[in-house]
Regions:
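His/Asp/Glu-rich mid-to-C-terminal helical/loop segments that flank catalytic regions of hydrolases
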Residues: 31, 35, 42-45, 154-200
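Alpha-helical metal-binding/catalytic segments enriched in His/Glu/Asp
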Residues: 3-57, 181
């Protein structure tokens, strides 16, 4: 299983909200798990992608080379892979998860979100979120999810604009996101079974 986001950004700015924030959250989630002495039953990989902005080439290359897909053939790791959680929608706080049409995970994620209800993390969107690295997994029939976030000024001011700079980052929101991501990763890594896959 894995958590992560993409390293590359558009050339007009430093890419603070797209997607240095997502990378920082994934790194901090791993640091949290290490700091609390977590002993997960499954390996948790941090997956930091190149060339997301050029068509998800980093994540799609990883899936193609290491996991495969049912149409073209799978690797031995395909059946063992559990889930990938992604952050790539700006600096805003997590509010839930896009389910990508996988209703089998609804009760699982709902239970995992309960400790964060007081922070407003309570939404499970039935809709698919497109255009970022979890899609490489989802399109190969593997569980891949993007967290649902507050938009802040993401689409209006920072997304692919020259204003995507450090002072637009909201540190307190990113701290909450790191805790939620760490919790989801730990829960997924401690399950007896991989995360359920949606019907194809």
């Amino acid at each position: 299983m894995g958590i992560g986001g993409h390293l590359d950004s558009w050339h007009t700015s430093t890419g603070a909200t797209d997607n240095a924030g997502g990378v920082a959250v994934a790194l901090e989630a791993m640091r949290i798990l290490e700091a609390i002495g977590a002993q997960p039953r499954r390996t948790i990989r941090i997956m930091l992608w190149s060339n997301e902005e050029g068509g998800l080439r980093g994540s799609r290359g990883y899936v193609r080379n290491h996991l495969g897909n049912p149409e073209d053939g799978t690797t031995p790791d395909y059946d063992d892979f559990s889930v990938y959680f992604n952050m790539d929608n700006g600096t805003g706080q997590f509010r839930g998860v896009h389910l990508q049409g996988n209703q089998l995970v609804r009760p699982i994620f709902s239970a995992w979100m309960e400790p964060f209800h007081d922070l407003g993390v309570r939404t499970l969107s039935q809709f698919s979120n497109r255009g970022t690295d979890h899609l490489a997994f989802d399109q190969a029939g593997l569980p891949g999810f993007q967290f649902l976030q507050d938009r802040i000024d993401y689409r209006a001011r920072t997304h692919h604009f020259n204003m995507d700079v450090f002072d637009k980052v909201l540190p307190e929101d990113l701290k909450i996101n790191a805790v939620v991501m760490a919790s989801f990763a730990y829960h997924a890594a401690m399950r007896d079974e991989p995360i359920p896959r949606k019907a194809r």
